[in-house]
């Protein structure tokens, strides 16, 4: 609307349908901010920054650094579209008392250039909107994981394994696929989290002593 209004103010007869046709034409190249960021980063210099990032979380899980490393690689693989047949079906869970900066750690996982793709406000009550988040965000933090009820945990397990998001337009009957970019991480102050023990293999539990992101 704003584009067509500005055009009309300049004396250009451009209506909403004209703007829509232009934006969806070959004259406007596709822009993917995460692909551009990864391209600009350049070749790896050999320094292990992922395990160093994981090391900021002091926890009781002896496998934490390696599991976080694999999860992180899978997250980036989603961004690049390396494997479109499988979802990043695991999620780290940071468990510890309030004030241990669990959410702060989750935010700094993404570089500043990509933090617009971070959210901690997903609502599992709206299944269509929650599924839309798979293609809208790069990292979804399930803050206060212990507040999710049994049925919502079942739906979360479903989301974790989905390679794409299946969406229906408002008032429409056609379902279209949207590429998935999002991976999940969670935080909680409580240790008693998982209502369905069969789904526990999808979560990397990390009981935190203290987290020290800088």
Walk through the language-model features, giving the residues of each.
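P-loop NTPase catalytic core of nucleic-acid-dependent motor ATPases
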Residues: 25-135
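Conserved catalytic/switch belt of AAA+ P-loop NTPases
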Residues: 154-176
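C-terminal regulatory/interaction module of P-loop NTP-utilizing enzymes
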Residues: 117-128, 191-200, 211
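Residue-level detector of conserved catalytic or cofactor/ligand-binding positions
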Residues: 206-214
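AAA+/SF3 P-loop NTPase mechanochemical coupling elements
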Residues: 130-135, 169-187
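Conserved AAA+/SF3 P-loop NTPase catalytic/coupling segment centered on the Walker-B
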Residues: 139-160, 194-199
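Long, basic/Gly/Ser/Thr-rich N-terminal segments
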Residues: 1-33
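Canonical AAA+ ATPase core
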Residues: 180-197, 202-207
């Amino acid at each position: 609307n704003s584009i067509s209004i500005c055009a009309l103010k300049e004396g250009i007869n451009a209506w909403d349908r004209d703007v829509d046709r232009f934006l969806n034409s070959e004259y406007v190249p596709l822009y993917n901010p995460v692909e551009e960021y990864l391209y600009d980063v350049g070749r790896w210099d050999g320094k292990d920054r992922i395990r160093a990032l994981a090391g900021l979380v002091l926890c009781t899980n002896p496998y934490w650094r390696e599991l976080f490393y694999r999860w992180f690689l899978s997250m980036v693989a989603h961004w690049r579209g390396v494997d479109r047949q499988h979802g990043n079906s695991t999620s780290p869970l940071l468990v510890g008392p309030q004030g241990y900066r669990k959410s702060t750690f989750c935010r700094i996982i993404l570089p500043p250039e990509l933090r617009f793709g971070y959210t901690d406000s997903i609502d599992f009550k709206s299944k269509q909107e929650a599924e839309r988040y798979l293609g809208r965000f790069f990292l979804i933090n399930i803050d206060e994981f212990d507040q999710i009820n049994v049925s919502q945990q079942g739906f979360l397990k479903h989301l974790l394994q989905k390679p794409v998001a299946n969406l229906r337009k408002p008032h429409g009957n056609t379902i279209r696929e949207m590429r998935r970019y999002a991976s999940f991480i969670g935080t909680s102050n409580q240790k008693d989290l998982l209502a369905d023990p069969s789904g526990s293999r999808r979560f990397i539990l990390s009981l935190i002593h203290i987290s020290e992101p800088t």
